[in-house]
Every structure is written in C-alpha cells, then in structure tokens.
C-alpha cells in the first residue's frame, strides 16, 4: 500500500463522513454513525490527551516515563486517523446484493418523484448509498420513506 492510497483513504473518509446522513433510522442498520461520532470525538479530544500525557510526565520530572508517554501520545494522535481510514475504506466498498437492491429502489423512488440524480451505478458503493440516502431524507416526505424505515 502506497502513501498515496492511504492519503486517499483519509480524504475519502472525510468525504464519506460529510455525506453520510446522521439519522436515527440508520443507526441500527449501519455502523457508520458510531464510527463518525467516535472519529469526530477523537479529532477534538485526542490531541489534548497526547499533549497531557507528555506534559504530565515532564511536569512531575518523571523523564524515565517519557518514552511510554510518547507512545501513548502517538497512539492518541492516530485514533482519528484510524476512524478516517476505516470510513475511507468503507466508502469504496461495493454494496452487498441486498443493499444494492435497496439502493436501486430508493434511487428509483427519488427519480420517479422528479428529482435529478447522478446516473445509476451498476456496482454501487457505500458512498453512493450515502448520497442516495442523503437525498432521500432531504427530498422525500415521510410517507415515501416508510417502506424502508
């Protein structure tokens, strides 16, 4: 795996995180909502944890424990990256057949109501599902969505 693909995974993860609809109806079906919340939390909190782990050892003149504190700091700093990497990989994963059917049904419902969409994908990925779900929640009324949720 090259650096370019890892970097692309991080970028895809950010895009997927921004695209995925954070709806309670989807929380029981997909793990994305938990990963997104954990990644956002880690992005806010883990840099402070990293700094505190190193500074606390320095403040108490415990330089012997500084290597362990640095290890904890590095681990804390990689936690948001782990979430972004997982989300990036997930966004490029092809949907299983049952979800692909669901994707097509929702896509057809949106287009049948007259809303413009990108062309239907033959091998949809989770990113396309996120886009379709996002559009469905924004443009369809609750009665149209009752069939799926």
From Swiss-Prot:
Keywords: Cell inner membrane, Cell membrane, Membrane, Transmembrane, Transmembrane helix. The chain crosses the membrane at residues 41-60, 65-87. One of its GO terms (cellular component) is plasma membrane. It is a multi-pass membrane protein. It is found in: Cell inner membrane. NCBIfam families: PRK01816.1 (NF002493). Belongs to the UPF0208 family. This is UPF0208 membrane protein PBPRA2797.
